[in-house]
């Protein structure tokens, strides 16, 4: 149990590890790797359900989400290396080494499962791995769209590069819709004024 407790403390570092790619286009308020993994896992779950409905498949959304929750854990030890850094450092090899060493402290069956997750994600050799990779890319594209809508036009490169890389039909449909949607659209209708008649007077609600 001591090793498991230490593992959990270790992955907590992801809350403080920044997702560094957008640093290159002048973004100061970088999200954390933990935040990236959480939204990617939820996107992965959604994509899997959509793909199953579209193609009549029975891919596990829970497995896809699990792959994504764990996939960046190696970055605790090597950091989140952006593409320019990867020109000089073999980040894939370093991250894999870190991930393997992390799992060595875990119970054998647990470690085996996590290593399978990692392999599926990196190699895209299963349907779950393909969807997980699409979800990971999409999360970066959604983050890029948020920066783009706030005025950083350089973020468009992330969106276009992700769009070219996506494999699943549902991911391709999602990014097409995302490009046409402002990141604030979800709350616009929630902020509309509502009026309720009370004692002959109209009282305004939902103003703030």
Please state what every model-predicted region is.
Residues 1-208:
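Alpha-helical, largely C-terminal catalytic domains
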């Amino acid at each position: 149990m001591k090793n498991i407790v230490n593992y959990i403390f270790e992955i907590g570092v992801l809350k403080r590890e920044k997702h560094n790619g957008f640093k290159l286009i002048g973004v100061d308020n970088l999200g954390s790797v933990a935040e990236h993994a959480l939204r990617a896992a939820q996107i992965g779950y959604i994509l899997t359900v959509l793909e199953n409905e579209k193609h009549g498949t029975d891919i596990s959304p829970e497995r896809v989400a699990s792959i994504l929750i764990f996939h960046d854990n190696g970055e605790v030890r090597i950091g989140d290396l952006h593409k320019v850094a990867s020109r000089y450092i073999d980040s894939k090899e370093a991250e894999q080494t870190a991930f393997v060493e992390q799992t060595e402290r875990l119970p054998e069956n647990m470690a085996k499962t996590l290593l399978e997750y990692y392999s599926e994600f990196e190699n895209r050799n299963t349907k779950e791995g393909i969807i997980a990779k699409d979800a990971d890319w999409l999360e970066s594209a959604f983050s890029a769209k948020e920066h783009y809508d706030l005025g950083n036009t350089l973020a468009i490169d992330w969106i276009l590069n992700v769009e070219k890389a996506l494999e699943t039909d549902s991911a391709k449909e999602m990014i097409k819709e995302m490009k046409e949607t402002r990141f604030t659209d979800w709350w616009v209708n929630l902020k509309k004024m509502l009026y309720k008649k009370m004692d002959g007077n109209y009282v305004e609600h939902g103003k703030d």
